[in-house]
Design a protein with these regions (language model features):
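Conserved catalytic network of the ASCE P-loop NTPase/AAA+ motor domain
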Residues: 214, 299-300, 346-348, 397, ...
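Conserved S-adenosyl-L-methionine
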Residues: 195-309, 314-318, 324-325, 333, ...
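C-terminal, active-site-flanking charged/polar segments
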Residues: 381-382, 394-444
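Short, contiguous acidic/charged loop-to-helix segments that flank catalytic cores in large enzymes
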Residues: 23, 45, 318-335, 360-368, ...
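Hydrophobic alpha-helix feature that most strongly marks membrane-spanning transmembrane helices
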Residues: 279, 312, 348-352, 362, ...
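Conserved Class I SAM-dependent methyltransferase catalytic core
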Residues: 50, 266-273, 288, 333-406
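Non-catalytic, mostly N-terminal accessory regions of nucleic-acid modification and defense proteins
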Residues: 1-217, 286-298, 387-391, 414-428, ...
């Protein structure tokens, strides 16, 4: 049953032109813009560095805000003088292992150091607070803190830190819904700045894929090429909206916070950014790991119920670094083929996958390309191929892509495959990506969730079914143009003698004009 989420936090595209997030107010956007500008004027101009430094300070404030909230509750119960058993900031002194000095725990708290003089604040944050949150990884306070060991504090001027702290202080870190939207807005600024955009999949495409797959509260969801955790975060929003009452139960809430979401990446910056993105959306301890998903580090098999991903597809790997179980299925160096093989391995029976792939996966003629498509059609249940226009990833890339949706069955269960030819996604397909009226996304979701109504569609329509046997007969090609019928208008031309007569008349007019010109001007 399709869940149309219309609670104001996650409005589906059924409610209008495209998926719309309720978003943040103009006031908060202005606050974030001012924080961003403070970094730039302070000499930090690389957008991913800005995001990282902002993330560190978010974490500092989150830790203090959380403890302040716990302390307020304890005080109401008459236990204000008793130290909280799980307090991050304890009573007494913290020994800084980097400076070998003892520092009062209270000085490490946002609510304290924000009132220091600029120079005192700068020294405290740079030498003490930053080192404190780096060493929190020893206690595994959160998924985020586990990836702080190689973090670097880049703010170089006290006045820059003061401006940023003042800006962040106006944000309520305990309001996870708003903070999740704030972080999404910051990620959007990172992409809009024109650098590091390769890390960011288009959010409206991610939201479409989440709507297509309809995550369930019982799912174990993974993105083996996590990046900023876009697929996982959009899944959290869907689940929170769809299962609001069920999440009040302790067991469900625990699964949501700890066991439901997994993500892997090799870049420490992405691990920190992705973990913070999840934390700000209420997932404090996801299974986020620093690992190469295609290597022998990753031994997961038959575990996840849902995988959604946009894996890297521009590179090749040496056989030596690829997991043997993947090469046994698909002997190739191409990452896009290896990741698809990996997804099959990591899913449990009945598990589902939606992945973005380059078009070459659909029609490549190498042995590995054909073997992968054969595996999907003959040994799994391939459900849908959604072909997307090449401009979807602009301005960062112009490659044509598609979404592949399948269920792991390990048996021949593909009867027919649904194809959709997306022509518009709500934005212009040039580098500017301006918002436009044309948008196929609502139609895609509506049709995918009502496939029984697609049986009458013809190859001349924008979506249609293709029998599995026809795909086998065409070397397992999944290119939509292989099966789509293009209706061409019959063009009726005039008879040859009529056309020749026009040429003769035109030639006579040209000769007449030339003679007139010579008579007037060339005597």
């Amino acid at each position: 049953m399709n869940k149309s989420i219309l609670d104001g936090r996650y409005q589906t595209i059924f409610a209008g032109k495209k998926t719309i997030m309720s978003g943040i107010t103009g006031k908060i956007k202005n606050q974030v813009d001012a924080i961003w500008m403070s970094f730039w004027t302070g000499g930090i101009t690389n957008s991913i560095d800005v995001l990282e430094q902002m993330t560190y300070l978010f974490f500092m404030k989150m830790l203090d805000d959380a403890q302040l909230s716990q302390e307020a509750k304890a005080a109401m119960m008459g236990m204000g003088d008793i130290e909280l058993p799980d307090a991050v900031f304890k009573k007494g002194l913290w020994h800084n292992p980097d400076t070998q000095k003892d520092v009062p725990y209270k000085n490490l708290r946002w609510s304290e150091f924000r009132n220091f003089t600029p120079e005192q604040m700068f020294d405290t944050v740079r030498f003490d607070v930053f080192n404190f949150i780096k060493h929190l990884s020893d206690a595994k306070t959160s998924a985020y803190s586990r990836f702080m060991s190689d973090a670097v504090f880049l703010i170089q001027q006290p006045r820059t830190l003061v401006k940023v702290v003042e800006g962040i202080n106006g944000l309520d870190m305990n309001d996870r819904d708003t903070m999740g939207d704030v972080y999404e807005y910051v990620l959007g600024k990172m992409a809009a700045s024109g650098t590091n955009g390769q890390f960011r999949s288009p959010r409206h495409i991610i939201r479409m894929m989440v709507e297509l797959m309809e995550p369930k509260l019982t799912d174990r969801i993974c993105d083996p090429a996590m990046g900023t955790a876009g697929f996982l975060v959009e899944s959290t929003k869907y689940v929170k909206a769809a299962y609001q009452q069920e999440l009040l139960k302790k067991q469900n809430a625990q699964h949501y916070r700890k066991g439901m979401f997994s993500g892997f990446d090799t870049d420490p910056k992405m691990l920190r950014i992705g973990s913070m993105n999840l934390m700000l959306n209420g997932v404090d301890d996801p299974d986020v790991r620093a690992q190469d998903s295609l290597s022998n580090q990753n031994t997961t098999e038959g575990y996840y119920t849902l995988i959604m991903a946009n894996p890297p597809f521009s590179g090749t790997l040496d056989y030596e670094v690829v997991n043997d179980t993947l090469l046994a299925k698909t002997r190739t160096k191409k990452t896009e083929l290896l990741f698809m093989t990996l997804f099959i391995r990591m899913l449990e029976l009945g598990g589902r996958c939606a992945s973005i792939v380059p078009d070459g996966v659909l029609f490549g003629t190498s042995t590995a390309h054909i073997a992968l498509r054969k595996e999907l059609v003959d040994n799994q249940r391939l459900e849908a191929i959604i072909s997307m226009p090449s401009g979807v990833f602009k301005p960062y890339a112009g490659v044509s892509t598609a979404i592949v949706i399948f269920t792991k069955t390990n048996s021949q269960s593909t009867d027919k495959v649904w194809f959709y030819d997306m022509k518009a996604d709500g934005f212009s397909l040039d580098d500017k990506r301006n918002e436009i009226q044309e948008n196929d996304i609502p139609d895609i979701i509506q049709r995918f969730h009502n496939l029984e109504g697609e049986a009458s569609r013809t190859r001349k329509d924008q979506s249609f079914f293709v029998p599995a046997q026809e795909i086998r007969d065409n070397d397992y090609s999944l290119a939509i143009n292989k099966y789509k019928e293009v209706e061409r208008e019959r063009v009726v031309y005039d008879a040859p003698e009529v056309i020749l007569g026009r040429f003769e008349q035109l030639q006579n007019e040209i000769t007449e004009a030339m003679n007139e010109f010579k008579t007037k001007y060339m005597k």
